[in-house]
From Swiss-Prot:
The KASH domain is involved in the binding to SUN1 and SUN2 through recognition of their SUN domains. Gene3D superfamilies: 1.20.58.60. GO terms for molecular function: actin filament binding; cytoskeleton-nuclear membrane anchor activity. Residues 947-975 are perinuclear space. This is Nesprin-3. Residues 778-798 are annotated as: Disordered. Residues 1-925 are cytoplasmic. It comes from Mus musculus. As a component of the LINC (LInker of Nucleoskeleton and Cytoskeleton) complex involved in the connection between the nuclear lamina and the cytoskeleton. The nucleocytoplasmic interactions established by the LINC complex play an important role in the transmission of mechanical forces across the nuclear envelope and in nuclear movement and positioning. Probable anchoring protein which tethers the nucleus to the cytoskeleton by binding PLEC which can associate with the intermediate filament system.
Length: 975
């Protein structure tokens, strides 16, 4: 009688336990908040479906209870405790399963809601961002007059204030993104995404700030021009009244007095002409920033004043003025012709050099590396040709000025022919550059096209092999699947190589197009992985069908041999390659071995059913499976390490090529200007040189970072490869040292030219600066080198080494005064917008005096005695560098606080006081005294040599310079 209830009870218990086990396994699979939003939503839907299955589980538990009641009613008393115990186990398992279902679903749902709220806030921010981009996108509209320009400036300031107000929302968004990233780990909210959002905001803010600065400068120029016009009109009115007083019948003055009066008036004409020329020069800039109607009004006003001045000039020796003007015009034209011929000759030399170096067409059978080298060469030539565009404009302008001069036909033809040659070279370079880039794009697209063909073939194989009728079909399609897997591995290698060329793709095709290509590659890799895994599963299924017709030994021995072969091949790949192609080939081989390891794992699992019932065979299968898994883990480590090595070597090679190209262009430019001093007469040439020289400090930092990266690459290369990298770095440093030597020579030439201009213009008036001591320096507006104030011989003020101690004391006093001002600005509390503006103005004043201080310090270096050990000067150099670093950091940090608030540092500390302290914040607070103690120890280290009398401060100053560089460095840490 009890046999049937017992079987029902056992069956219901097994059904319930199996159902709960399946549910718990599904929950464990979905119990994860990491990953993209689509995956999170999928897990949320899965957990929701699982929660909806609670009623089904309840039914199964009820069946167990009913079966238990029936069994308890018919069983013996000795069996009841066991049945009741099993019932309690079932109930506890059911409660645990229900609790797990609820908690898992709630946790995933909370993270999803948090993410949704963040996306809403992000969308709101980007709507504002797009609105602001649209508002700032149109160019600045030209205005009619000064009042309209001031209104336009006010509107731009309102936009800038709106941008500043959005900083709070951005900070909140970044904080929420960081919190969300710690839970989901999705790249859309990682640190790079936060940096991109911050960078976009900074770009809009910079654009708004540039617009405000531009409009402020435009309004200021127009206002200054209007004041000068009013002053000139008052002078012109006074001169007209004097002239009219000397003319006509009503004039009672004698003839001698009239002539004397007219001669006195004529002496004022040069000053009036100079003032009018200055007004016309100012008007050029003002007209460029004024609407056509306003520009017409300004031009008419200038023409009217010019007409009045010319009428007055007619009264004084017309013929003599005409002859003198003719002679002066002829002399100016001859000088301009000489300058034009000199610049034309230099331009021809530059074109010949560029034509010989960078206009060879690309060979169609060139390799990818050769195409990249050609593209870089064409890019360098393109940049060099673009840098010659201002020179072409100058040649055309000078030729237009000399078009009325006789005997200029040959020079004019030469200029026109040279410009036509330049345009032809520019067009040819553009065609070659575009053709090379198009060829590279086709080369990089080939793996994607091949993958599309392979995907169709793989999908067709999967469809055909879904159900095979006999062993002959399996033997037919299994080699095809293996061939498809081999082709898949080859495609994966090619796509992996594309993913390692991020910097190269960005430099060739632009960041946006390169990002699109890399996204396509990433998507294609995912599709390939899915199909590859499907093919592996299908291959395993077919192999398992074949294995069923074999015994264990026949199936196991090939797997063991394949495992030993993989171990030997992996051991052979643990060496360090020589160069970048070797590392790339090693990476491809390791990825192929990784695919073979995965295939081996599937084959082992296919053999496992043959070992059932034999413990010895099962032990062999377990052992080879463990060995395969260990092998796969070591392969993953090797692949990750090799990918990192390839990525670092690619970055090193790319940056090395860019630096070498820039150094070559800069060296050629400096050598061309150093060889022909006549080009220094053109102010635009000197301005271009100053721009080039200003880029050298930034490139010096890049050279240092490249050396550090090169050391890292050398450690991860073979001895021969390390020698090659070291040789490349040595050549780079040689070319860099040669460039620095050229820079020093060029700076010396520029100073000499400035001194020559100053000596020629001895009539210029010297003015005192308002920010140095009374016994300080006298600054000439046209002379960047400061001089001491003396009343007798000027040479006594700047050429005698005996005055060096006095100059040193004066500079120390000036630097101490500037430091005091900076400290007062830092400690200033901002209560209103006016206070904020005052503080910004004071900081700008300090920054504006930095070039002046640099000139003073260079003067100290120039006048330093030859045998002076310069310990005091080295200490002063360190204090000067430290002041500049502190001023730069203060300009970035202090201006971030809004009116009515403390500074950015004080505000952050006050906010942290009320925020919940996490474990990381507590650790930082505990470590803060230790950090301060470490900084004090570092300060003591480079101050200790100052106490030794016999040693110089060179070591301490070198350390101080490196410490100041660390203070100013804002980029990522060097690798």
């Amino acid at each position: 009688m009890t046999q049937q209830p017992q079987e029902d009870f056992e069956r219901s218990v097994e059904d319930a336990q199996a159902w709960m086990k399946v549910i718990q396994e599904q929950l464990q699979v979905n119990d994860n908040t990491k990953g993209p939003r689509a995956a999170l939503e999928a897990r949320l839907r899965e957990t929701e479906k699982i929660c909806q299955l609670e009623s089904e589980g309840m039914v199964k538990v009820e069946l167990v209870l009913r079966a238990a009641e029936a069994l308890l009613a018919t069983c013996q008393e000795g069996q009841k405790p066991e049945i009741l115990a099993r019932l309690r186990d079932i109930k506890s398992q059911w409660e645990e399963t229900v609790t797990y279902m609820t908690h898992c679903h709630s946790r995933i749902e909370w993270v999803w809601l948090h993410w949704s709220e963040y996306l809403l806030a992000q969308d709101e921010f980007y709507r504002w961002f797009q609105k602001m981009v649209v508002a700032l996108e149109p160019p600045v509209e030209l205005q009619l007059g000064l009042k309209e320009k001031q209104w336009q400036l006010s509107h731009a300031q309102v936009l800038l204030h709106n941008v500043d107000n959005q900083a709070v929302l951005l900070d909140r968004l970044l904080e929420e993104a960081g919190s969300l990233f710690s839970r989901i780990g999705d790249p859309s909210v990682d640190e790079d995404a936060q940096k991109r959002m911050k960078a976009e905001y900074d770009a809009v803010k910079a654009r708004a700030q540039r617009r405000v600065d531009l409009l402020a400068q435009v309004a200021q120029d127009h206002e200054q021009y209007r004041e000068d016009v009013n002053e000139f009109q008052l002078w012109l009115k006074a001169v007209v009244e004097k002239v009219h007083s000397c003319l006509g019948r009503n004039c009672k003055l004698a003839t001698e007095l009239r002539l004397s009066t007219l001669q006195d008036i004529a002496k004022d004409f040069p000053r009036g002409e100079e003032s009018l020329k200055r007004l016309e020069e100012q008007a050029v800039g003002v007209i460029q920033n004024t609407s056509p109607l306003g520009a017409e009004k300004i031009s008419g006003e200038l023409e009217e004043m010019r007409g009045v001045l010319e009428k007055l000039r007619v009264l004084w020796k017309e013929e003599e003025g005409r002859l003198r003007g003719l002679l002066q015009s002829r002399g100016d034209c001859e000088q301009q012709i000489q300058q034009l011929e000199a610049e034309l000759g230099d331009f021809k030399k530059s074109l010949q050099r560029l034509a010989q170096e960078g206009l060879e067409p690309t060979v169609k059978t060139a390799t990818e590396d050769e195409l990249v080298a050609q593209w870089r060469l064409f890019s360098g030539t393109r940049a060099a040709l673009a840098s010659e565009e201002p020179r072409v404009d100058r040649l055309q302008t000078q030729l237009k000025k000399l078009v009325t001069f006789p005997d200029l036909q040959s020079l004019s033809d030469s200029v026109v022919a040279t410009i036509q040659e330049y345009q032809s070279m520019k067009g040819k370079n553009t065609r070659l550059h575009n053709a090379t880039r198009a060829e590279l794009w086709q080369r990089f697209q080939r793996p994607l096209n091949d993958l599309q063909l392979w995907k169709a073939l793989a999908q067709r194989l999967l469809d055909i092999t879904a159900s095979l009728p006999d062993l002959a079909s399996i033997h037919t399609f299994l080699p095809q699947i293996e061939a498809a897997l081999t082709e898949s591995s080859r495609l994966k290698e090619q796509l992996a190589m594309l993913q390692l060329k991020t910097d190269l793709l960005g430099s060739i095709f632009g960041q946006e197009r390169a990002a699109t290509l890399l996204e396509q590659v990433t998507s294609s890799v995912r599709d390939r992985d899915l199909l590859h895994n499907s093919l592996l599963q299908r291959k395993s299924k077919l192999q398992s069908l074949l294995v069923q017709h074999k015994d264990f030994g026949v199936a196991f021995d090939p797997l063991n041999r394949k495992l030993l072969d993989l171990q030997a091949r992996i051991q052979a790949e643990k060496g360090l390659p020589r160069d970048l192609p070797g590392k790339q080939v090693q990476l491809l081989r390791l990825q192929g071995l990784q695919e073979e390891g995965l295939d081996l794992g599937t084959q082992i699992e296919a053999v496992r059913p043959l070992a059932h019932g034999n413990s010895k065979h099962q032990q062999k299968v377990d052992q080879i499976s463990c060995d395969q898994q260990a092998l796969q883990r070591s392969l993953e480590d090797l692949v990750d390490r090799c990918q990192q090595n390839v990525r670092e070597h690619c970055t090193f090679s790319h940056r090395l090529s860019e630096l070498q190209l820039w150094i070559t262009m800069a060296t050629q430019t400096l050598e061309s200007h150093q060889g022909d001093v006549r080009l220094w007469d053109a102010e635009s040439q000197e301005a271009g040189l100053e721009t080039l020289l200003s880029e050298i400090p930034e490139k010096e930092v890049q050279v240092s970072l490249l050396q550090a990266l090169g050391q890292l690459v050398m450690k991860k290369s073979s001895p021969e490869g390390a020698t090659m990298v070291q040789e490349e770095l040595r050549k780079l440093m040689e070319s860099w040292q040669a460039l620095r030597l050229l820079e020093e020579n060029m700076l010396s030439l520029m100073r000499n030219q400035q001194l020559q201009r100053t000596e020629v213009d001895t009539g210029k008036k010297q003015v005192f600066t308002n920010n140095i001591p009374k016994a300080g320096f006298l600054i000439n507006p046209q002379d960047p080198i400061p001089r001491r104030q003396h009343g007798a011989n000027p040479l006594e003020g700047h050429d005698l080494p005996e005055d060096h101690p006095q100059l040193l004391r004066d500079f120390e006093q000036w630097l101490q005064a500037e430091n005091s001002k900076l400290r007062r600005i830092i400690t200033m509390r901002v209560a209103t917008a006016k206070d904020l503006r005052t503080r910004e103005v004071k900081l700008q004043e300090l920054e504006a005096r930095i070039p002046e201080g640099q000139h003073l310090f260079e003067n100290l270096l120039r006048l330093r005695p030859a045998r002076d050990p310069s310990n005091e000067l080295e200490d002063l150099r360190y204090r000067w560098m430290l002041y500049k670093s502190k001023l730069k950091d203060s300009g970035h940090l202090l201006t971030e606080s809004s009116p009515g608030e403390l500074t950015a540092f004080q505000k952050s500390r006050r906010q942290k006081r009320w925020s919940p302290c996490s474990l990381l914040q507590k650790a930082c607070r505990v470590a803060l005294p230790l950090q301060l103690l470490l900084l004090l120890f570092l300060l003591l280290l480079f101050l200790l040599p100052a106490g030794e009398e016999e040693r110089s401060c060179a070591l301490a100053n070198n350390f101080a310079r490196s410490f100041a560089l660390m203070l100013r460095y804002n980029g990522p840490p060097p690798t």
